[in-house]
UniProtKB/Swiss-Prot annotation:
Chief place where the protein resides: mitochondrion
Membrane topology annotation: Single-pass membrane protein
InterPro entries listed in its UniProt record: MIC60
Free-text function comment from the UniProt entry: Component of the MICOS complex, a large protein complex of the mitochondrial inner membrane that plays crucial roles in the maintenance of crista junctions, inner membrane architecture, and formation of contact sites to the outer membrane. Plays a role in keeping cristae membranes connected to the inner boundary membrane. Also promotes protein import via the mitochondrial intermembrane space assembly (MIA) pathway.
Coiled-coil stretches noted in the UniProt entry, renumbered to this chain: 356-494
Stated name of the protein: MICOS complex subunit MIC60
C-alpha cells in the first residue's frame, strides 16, 4: 500500500522537483524500475525516522503527509544518473519500522524476487541478473557546505594576503579590517626577506647570540670595609678650609684596598676580553670597576653604624669628551657622567676617585678608537667607492665598446640590407617602368592606327561629298545661278531701302542746319532788332520729333523772337552810353539826394579811367573789365561783371543786362540746335 500511495501521489509533484515517471510495477524498463526503487528507499527512510507504522489502507491525510516528506527528501538530494544501478530492496511488511542506518547493505549476489506485503495481490516482476553497487549512504549537506565555506574563506584570505603584497591600497584595507591580516602579511614579508637575504639574518643571529663575558669573580677582603678609626678613613677627604680637628696626610696618597681590588679585577677582565670587539671591551672594565661599590657601601653601613661628625665630600669632575659628535661616545659619556653624579652625591666619593680617573682615560681611549674606526671605515668606504667607480667606468667603457661594435655590425648589416633592398626596389621599379613604357607604346600605336582609320573614313566621306556636290552643281547649273542672282537682288533692295532712310535723315538734318543758319544770319546782319518768328518756326517744324530742339526753342523768351534782339555792335554802343552814366553815379550812396547827385557828377569829371585788366572790385574796374570782354566778344563774362555791381550802378545797367541775357539765351539755343543736328549726322554715318 505504501508503494501504491507513492505511485498515486507522484503525479502531484512539480516537474522541477522530480521528473514524471510511470507506476512502479507497470514499468518494463530496468532503468525506470531501479529509479523508482531508489525513490521508495528514501521515502521508507523518512517514514521510519518519523516512527510511524505503515497502514494497509492509506487515507488522504497519510498520502499528503507522505507526499510532503517525499518532496523534501527529493529536493534535498535528487537522484542522479549513478542511482540507476541501485538495487531495489524488498518491500517491508505493514507493521515493520525500519531505520536507514539499520538497513544492511545487500551482498554482491544476483537479486531475488521482490517480496510483497500480505495484503498485496500484485506480484513483483523478475529482476535481471546483474550486480548493482550498494546503495549510497545519506550524505550530510551541512558538512559539505561548511567545508566549502571554509575552503572559500581560506582561498579568499590567501588571495587577500597575496594581493596585499602587490598593492599598497589593498594592503592598508586588508591589514586594517581583516583579523590577523597584518600578522600574516608581515610573516610572508619576513619569509621573503630571509629567502632573499639569508646571510643577513645569520649575521644578526650571530651578533645577538654572542655570550657576554662576565669577567673574573671579585672577592672583597674582610678588612676593606669601614673601620672604627674615623680620622684615618677620612684623611683624603679632609677639608682644610673647615674648622675642626685636622687629619694627618700620611696615608693620603696611598690607594685603598678596594681600589686595588677593582684595578686587579679590571686588568683580569681586559686580558680575557681582548679578542672581543673594541666597543664591547670598552664597556666591561667600567662595569667591573663599578659593580663592587654598592656591596662595599652596604657592608660599611652594617659594620659602622656611626658616621663621622664632619664628613668630607670631594666632588668628582665630570667627563668632557672633545670628540663627542659620535652617538655611541655621547651615550657612553652621558652614562659615565650619570655614574659620576651618583658617586659624587655619596659621602664616600673620595674612594672612587682613582677608578673614575682610569675609567675616564679608558673612555677617552674608547672615543678615540671609535673615531679612528669610523675614520678607517670611511676611508675603506671611500676606497671601495673609488674601486666601484673605477670598475663601473671600466664596465661602462667595455659596454660602450661592445655597443659600438654591435652598432657598427648592425650598421653594416643594415647597410647591406638597405643596398640589397634598394637594388630589389630599383630592379622592380625598372621592370615596372619598362612594362609601362611598353604598354604606353602599344597604346600609342593602337591610337595611331585608329586615327589613320578615322582619317581614311573621313577622306572617303569627304570624297563622296565632293563627288555629290559636283554632280549636283553640274545637274543644277543654271538653277543655282538664278537663285544666287535672286539673293543678290534681294540684298540690293534691302540696301536701297536702308539708304533711302539715310538720305531722308540727312536731308532733314541739312534742312535743320539751313534753318538754324538762317536764324543766325538774320540776327547778325540786322542793324536794328528784327523779329525771327518765321525762321524759328521753320526750325521747330523740321525738328518736330526732336525733344532736345523743342526744349531749346522753349527756353527762348517770346519777347526775344517777337521783337528781336540787338546785335553785338549795338550792345557795345549801348554799353558805352550806360558806362558813362554809371561812372557819374558811382559815388552815390543808396539814399542819395540832389546834392549827392551833383557832387558825384562833378567828381566823375575829375576821376580818371582805368586801362588794362584791373583786379579791384570798384565800379571803374568792373566797367573796364566789362568793356574788354565786350571787345573780345565774350558777352557771358561781360554780363557776369555787370551783374556784380551794387546800388545806383546796378540800377542804371539793369536794362542793358536784360538785353544781354536775351542775346545769350538765343545764342545758347542756336548752339544746342546745331549740336543736335551734328549728332544726327554722326548717327547716320
Amino acid at each position: 500500500m505504501l508503494r501504491t500511495s507513492i505511485a498515486s501521489s507522484r503525479p502531484l509533484l512539480p516537474s522541477s522537483v522530480c521528473p514524471k515517471a510511470p507506476a512502479q510495477w507497470l514499468c518494463t524498463s530496468r532503468a525506470r524500475r531501479v529509479n523508482t526503487a531508489t525513490r521508495r528507499y528514501h521515502a521508507l527512510a523518512r517514514k521510519s525516522n518519523a516512527g510511524r507504522r505503515c497502514s494497509l489502507t492509506p487515507n488522504t491525510a497519510t498520502t499528503s503527509q507522505f507526499f510532503q516528506k517525499a518532496a523534501s527528501s527529493t529536493s534535498t538530494k535528487p537522484p542522479g544518473p549513478s542511482d540507476a544501478d541501485v538495487r531495489s530492496p524488498a518491500s517491508p511488511s505493514s507493521r515493520s519500522s525500519l531505520r536507514p542506518e539499520s538497513i544492511p547493505k545487500p551482498p554482491q549476489s544476483p537479486p531475488v524476487q521482490g517480496q510483497t506485503s500480505p495484503g498485496s495481490e500484485v506480484l513483483p516482476p523478475d529482476h535481471e541478473s546483474s550486480t548493482p553497487p550498494p546503495p549510497p549512504g545519506p550524505k550530510s549537506s551541512r558538512l559539505r557546505k561548511l567545508l566549502y565555506l571554509f575552503l572559500t574563506a581560506g582561498l579568499a584570505y590567501a588571495g587577500g594576503v597575496w594581493y596585499s603584497l602587490r598593492s599598497d591600497n589593498f594592503y592598508d584595507f586588508f591589514t586594517e579590517y581583516i583579523p590577523y591580516g597584518e600578522e600574516a602579511v608581515l610573516y610572508l614579508e619576513e619569509r621573503d626577506f630571509r629567502n632573499r637575504f639569508p646571510h643577513v639574518t645569520k649575521q644578526i643571529n650571530r651578533r645577538v647570540t654572542v655570550p657576554k663575558d662576565e669577567g673574573a669573580q671579585v672577592t672583597i677582603p674582610s678588612g676593606s670595609g669601614l673601620s672604627w678609626k674615623v680620622a684615618e678613613e677620612q684623611q683624603e677627604a679632609t677639608d682644610m678650609t673647615k674648622k675642626g680637628r685636622r687629619m694627618g696626610t700620611a696615608h693620603a696618597n696611598e690607594p685603598t684596598k678596594d681600589i686595588k681590588v677593582a684595578e686587579k679585577a679590571k686588568e683580569e677582565v681586559k686580558s680575557k676580553s681582548a679578542a672581543k670587539k673594541e666597543d664591547v671591551a670598552a664597556n666591561i672594565p667600567i662595569q667591573e670597576a663599578l659593580e663592587p661599590q654598592p656591596a662595599k657601601t652596604e657592608e660599611k653601613n652594617l659594620e659602622a653604624p656611626r658616621q663621622p661628625a664632619v664628613p668630607a665630600v670631594t666632588a668628582i669632575e665630570r667627563l668632557v669628551q672633545d670628540k663627542a659628535d659620535e652617538p655611541v661616545v655621547q651615550d657612553l659619556v652621558k652614562v659615565f657622567n650619570d655614574v659620576i653624579s651618583v658617586i659624587s652625591a655619596d659621602e664616600s666619593a673620595s674612594k672612587f676617585a682613582g677608578p673614575i680617573a682610569k675609567a675616564k682615560e679608558e673612555l677617552q681611549r674608547i672615543g678615540d678608537r671609535i673615531v679612528a674606526l669610523k675614520k678607517d671605515a670611511q676611508e675603506s668606504a671611500q676606497e671601495e667607492i673609488r674601486n666601484a667607480h673605477a670598475a663601473f667606468d671600466k664596465s661602462a667603457a667595455e659596454l660602450i665598446r661592445r655597443i659600438d661594435e654591435v652598432r657598427t655590425q648592425d650598421a653594416a648589416e643594415f647597410r647591406e640590407e638597405f643596398e640589397s633592398e634598394r637594388e630589389k626596389i630599383a630592379r622592380s621599379y625598372q621592370e615596372k617602368v619598362n612594362t609601362e613604357l611598353q604598354r604606353a607604346h602599344e597604346v600609342a600605336e593602337q591610337r595611331l592606327r585608329n586615327e589613320l582609320v578615322e582619317q581614311a573614313i573621313e577622306l572617303n566621306r569627304k570624297f563622296l561629298s565632293d563627288v555629290k556636290t559636283l554632280v549636283e552643281n553640274e545637274r543644277e547649273g543654271r538653277l543655282s545661278k538664278l537663285a544666287e542672282l535672286s539673293a543678290n537682288v534681294a540684298e540690293l533692295e534691302r540696301l536701297t531701302a536702308g539708304w533711302s532712310d539715310v538720305v531722308d535723315i540727312n536731308l532733314k538734318t541739312q534742312q535743320l542746319q539751313v534753318a538754324v543758319d538762317a536764324v543766325r544770319t538774320t540776327l547778325e546782319n540786322s542793324d536794328v532788332p528784327r523779329p525771327f518768328v518765321r525762321e524759328l518756326a521753320a526750325v521747330k517744324e523740321l525738328a518736330s520729333n526732336d525733344e532736345v530742339v523743342a526744349a531749346a526753342i522753349a527756353s527762348i523768351s517770346p519777347a526775344a523772337y517777337q521783337r528781336g534782339i540787338p546785335s553785338a555792335a549795338q550792345l557795345v554802343d549801348r554799353f558805352r552810353r550806360v558806362a558813362s552814366e554809371v561812372r557819374k553815379a558811382r559815388l552815390l550812396p543808396e539814399n542819395a539826394g540832389i546834392t549827392s547827385h551833383a557832387a558825384s557828377l562833378v567828381l566823375s569829371k575829375v576821376m580818371l579811367k582805368k586801362q588794362g585788366l584791373p583786379t579791384s572790385d570798384d565800379v571803374e574796374s568792373i566797367l573796364t573789365r566789362t568793356e574788354n570782354f565786350l571787345e573780345e566778344g565774350n558777352f557771358d563774362e561781360a554780363a557776369r561783371e555787370m551783374n556784380s555791381l551794387q546800388g545806383w550802378a546796378k540800377l542804371l545797367s539793369k536794362d542793358w543786362l536784360a538785353d544781354v541775357r536775351r542775346v545769350l539765351e538765343v545764342k545758347q539755343a542756336l548752339e544746342i540746335i546745331e549740336t543736335e543736328a551734328r549728332l544726327r549726322c554722326l548717327q547716320v554715318e
